[in-house]
């Protein structure tokens, strides 16, 4: 069975992420969406909130071979502990590729048994980024349904109302 890991912070999960997961599921028998923590990032949502929201969104799509998990450690460790042979990384533009390629070289030296698979973003999601969504959600008048599922938009709006009150 070909199992792939699709790691990310998912703060929040976007249609761009969902598109990449769907496309990865066409290549692999099983895809694990891994909600991970990056100590260099500051998050709007807690790790539990990011996991629960990502889980709800993926579950609502009814995909049987896609699973959600969370991990607070090095992604390569998770992959090795769970016998996962592939890590899928989305790339939107050249600067993403440059960053991901550097990661690929390091990961390959540390664990050559795990292959990194780069998937380019679909055209309509090239400029969809979680940080952009967080910036736009501050203005409650924007309809962000082309960036994020309604479930995510409702959660973020309620989160911002709580933070701003």
From Swiss-Prot:
<keyword id="KW-0067">ATP-binding</keyword>
<feature type="site" description="Transition state stabilizer">
    <location>
        <position position="17"/>
    </location>
</feature>
<feature type="binding site">
    <location>
        <begin position="90"/>
        <end position="92"/>
    </location>
    <ligand>
        <name>ATP</name>
    </ligand>
</feature>
<comment type="similarity">
    <text>Belongs to the bacterial CoaD family.</text>
</comment>
<dbReference type="InterPro" id="IPR004821">
    <property type="entry name" value="Cyt_trans-like"/>
</dbReference>
<comment type="pathway">
    <text>Cofactor biosynthesis; coenzyme A biosynthesis; CoA from (R)-pantothenate: step 4/5.</text>
</comment>
<keyword id="KW-0547">Nucleotide-binding</keyword>
<dbReference type="GO" id="GO:0005524">
    <property type="term" value="F:ATP binding"/>
</dbReference>
<dbReference type="InterPro" id="IPR014729">
    <property type="entry name" value="Rossmann-like_a/b/a_fold"/>
</dbReference>
<dbReference type="Pfam" id="PF01467">
    <property type="entry name" value="CTP_transf_like"/>
</dbReference>
<keyword id="KW-0808">Transferase</keyword>
<comment type="function">
    <text>Reversibly transfers an adenylyl group from ATP to 4'-phosphopantetheine, yielding dephospho-CoA (dPCoA) and pyrophosphate.</text>
</comment>
<feature type="binding site">
    <location>
        <position position="100"/>
    </location>
    <ligand>
        <name>ATP</name>
    </ligand>
</feature>
<comment type="subunit">
    <text>Homohexamer.</text>
</comment>
<keyword id="KW-0963">Cytoplasm</keyword>
<dbReference type="InterPro" id="IPR001980">
    <property type="entry name" value="PPAT"/>
</dbReference>
<feature type="binding site">
    <location>
        <position position="17"/>
    </location>
    <ligand>
        <name>ATP</name>
    </ligand>
</feature>
<dbReference type="GO" id="GO:0015937">
    <property type="term" value="P:coenzyme A biosynthetic process"/>
</dbReference>
<protein>
    <recommendedName>
        <fullName>Phosphopantetheine adenylyltransferase</fullName>
        <ecNumber>2.7.7.3</ecNumber>
    </recommendedName>
</protein>
<feature type="binding site">
    <location>
        <begin position="125"/>
        <end position="131"/>
    </location>
    <ligand>
        <name>ATP</name>
    </ligand>
</feature>
<keyword id="KW-0173">Coenzyme A biosynthesis</keyword>
<feature type="binding site">
    <location>
        <position position="41"/>
    </location>
    <ligand>
        <name>substrate</name>
    </ligand>
</feature>
<feature type="binding site">
    <location>
        <begin position="9"/>
        <end position="10"/>
    </location>
    <ligand>
        <name>ATP</name>
    </ligand>
</feature>
<dbReference type="GO" id="GO:0005737">
    <property type="term" value="C:cytoplasm"/>
</dbReference>
<feature type="binding site">
    <location>
        <position position="75"/>
    </location>
    <ligand>
        <name>substrate</name>
    </ligand>
</feature>
<dbReference type="GO" id="GO:0004595">
    <property type="term" value="F:pantetheine-phosphate adenylyltransferase activity"/>
</dbReference>
<keyword id="KW-0548">Nucleotidyltransferase</keyword>
<feature type="binding site">
    <location>
        <position position="89"/>
    </location>
    <ligand>
        <name>substrate</name>
    </ligand>
</feature>
<feature type="binding site">
    <location>
        <position position="9"/>
    </location>
    <ligand>
        <name>substrate</name>
    </ligand>
</feature>
<keyword id="KW-0460">Magnesium</keyword>
